[in-house]
Amino acid sequence: MEEQAFPNVFLIGEHSEYYAEISEQHPAILLTVFNNDMEFAFEKWAGMLVEMENFAKEINYDINGVKLFLHVYFNPDGKIKYLSYYPKPNSKNVPNAEITAFFKSFAKVYQLQVNADIGFQHYASASFPTFFGNINKETAKK
């Protein structure tokens, strides 16, 4: 795969010829990276979504009403290598170019607090606003 030609943010279903290679580069999953501690892994994921929401507020981007499937591929240091998404049918209508630009900007600045041995991935759905006000903020920052 040509690193330069392949986008780091794309719609799920696009570039399907590269999925096997991307998955090989990120063989672990979020849960195993956090020693199969479901609560801790969930708080890390929720913390990332809260950071996404905060980033949207910082740049004055209205993400509220957006509902989508996310597949995020992380480097071992927690930086986002690839992010693919697909809007849910009940999502607020947002142009793909706009949400792609948002995710590209977020991926440049975000780093999950983790020290993994290998790349890892997580696939889940997300809705904004998150309503994760009760997550343990200390866990999310660890």
Locations of the language-model features?
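Charge-biased low-complexity segments
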Residues: 1-142
